[in-house]
């Protein structure tokens, strides 16, 4: 919650707490599953389905990709509870029909912030520093 308090000190977005169906799916405790929760919220898919899908996607990426990133993940659990890498997130969103649109590029500095007047209307999955969240028509 401290993350959101710091974030909201500079934002004009309304805050709505939503676990994306995590508790209803029987999951308890804290987790780094912001990707699962965010995708469940924006797509309307169940938390459990998104969790299971991302588990498989994480495992597939780790075992089939020849990248340095995949090799470094060999020691890691495939569970989306402990995070999902951006490469896997983008691939999964594409399968669901979503388009990843970057607003920041190398060498350009930060031009878009979590402020209502800087974000387009509609439903967005927003990437912050080591976190993914949802903004829907000005509500975080």
Task: Name these PLM-found stretches.
Residues 2-73, 87, 91, 95-98:
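Active-site nucleophile-adjacent alpha helix/oxyanion-hole segment immediately C-terminal to the catalytic cysteine
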Residues 61-130, 136-138:
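Conserved active-site-adjacent core of cysteine acyl-enzyme catalytic domains
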């Amino acid at each position: 919650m401290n993350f959101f308090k710091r974030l909201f000190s500079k934002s004009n977005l309304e805050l709505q707490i939503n676990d994306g169906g995590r508790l209803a799916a029987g999951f308890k405790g804290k987790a780094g599953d912001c990707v699962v929760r965010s995708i469940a919220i924006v797509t309307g898919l169940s938390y459990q389905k998104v969790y299971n899908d991302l588990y498989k996607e994480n495992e597939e990426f780790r075992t089939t990709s020849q990248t340095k990133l995949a090799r470094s993940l060999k020691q890691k659990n495939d569970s989306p509870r402990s995070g999902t890498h951006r490469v896997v997130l983008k691939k999964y969103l594409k399968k669901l029909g979503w388009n990843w649109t970057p607003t920041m590029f190398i060498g350009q500095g930060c031009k878009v912030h979590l402020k209502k007047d800087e974000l387009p209307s509609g439903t967005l999955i927003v990437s912050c520093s080591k976190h993914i969240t949802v903004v829907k028509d000005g509500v975080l």
